Amino acid sequence: MNTRMEHDTMGEIAVPADHHWGAQTQRSLENFQIGGQRQPREIITAFAWLKEACALANADCGKLTAEQAGAIAAVCREIRAGKWDEEFPLVVWQTGSGTQTNMNVNEVIAHLAADRGVQLHPNDHVNASQSSNDTFPSALHIAAALSITEQVLPTAERLAAAFRKLEEGYPDLIRIGRTHLQDATPLKFAQEVSGWRELVEAPCRMLRAALPELQKLAIGGTAVGTGLNAPEGYDEMVCRRLREMTGADFTPDENKFHALTSKDALVFAHGALKALAANLMKIANDIRWEASGPRCGMGELRIPENEPGSSIMPGKVNPTQCEAVTMAAVQVMGNDAAIGFAASQGNFQLNVFLPVSAYNFQLSARLLTDVMDSFRVHCVEGITPDAEKMTANLNNSLMLVTCLTPKIGYEAAAACAKKALHDGTTLREAVLALGYLTGPEFDETVRPEKMV
């Protein structure tokens, strides 16, 4: 491998000649050969937004020339476009402040600018008015906020729309309800599906409620929150540039001491992701139970047959999309535990669990985004109810007896249900045998369409 020599304050080190990072990135590569989980691309993209905004703000206050700021901005745009993804090889398991990733970005920007004739120092120019201690927390928040608004919410809205279409397609179909895994009173199939839709829409409102705190940035706090070496008003200048570039409402955190040491906004936002995961698991479980069969299960729903389900049982088709949803949900719940514990470790002036927090948040956002689209396309949009099976189960249910309570009383109604169950007869036959109602009276009283 061809190398070139780079130096930092610790001396010289050989760096691959065909890459654009510098000495500090190389030291991190050699010192932290752990796991293999690289910094999420969303974090690198967020850094590229942040570094461009910082460069333009530094030019505004005279700390960089227009040429220097322009060179930084040009490279940042290419990084966001994915042109230099291979230049960001560092793993999550590094320093807890994310310093090495910050320097990785600084070094790559400086080297690429130099290739174009603009000499920049990674620290003095690209990192001017900044510290890893305020840039990584800011990039973390930028990435989280944009992942919510650009990925999770649009995907969730598409899934909710698919449920609304299913809901509107069967306005009059009545089915038996179930509570405690036992038969309950009837409801419309559309009403059940409306519940599934709201299970997607409610966490979306929670995510939107989390955005204002998540959009508060630590930038301008520098090392410990005092703003040392940052010009006055620098935080607002950076955030103004970010607002212009991204369209998101990023603002300076008014208390930088809080911003550097706390990750409560991330915990709150991820809590909404966990709520979405929990609701998706409930929906997936409902659907796969109701689609169980084809002959010996509930069989009230038909779901798409996407692939063979068994290597030994010919013709078997499984609810694979539902299973993928439930596994993704479990992972998100595990990620939530990691983020919560990491947030509790903000000792003194800095939280040093930032990379693992960023990794888990982005993993959750990506999993939920991908699994919701997959679930929608390969399952939800192909769901059809088995109206015949639903109606048969409805008519066979003893819980229709509930509508008799106002007419014959709770205890008499219970006696009718127990007799029908014990004798293996219909509810109508039991009521007539006990003499509580005549046939016409029963038929007039027990009408499922009036119970929903």
Kindly give the residue locations of the regions a language model identified.
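Conserved, well-structured ligand/cofactor-binding cores
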Residues: 1-452
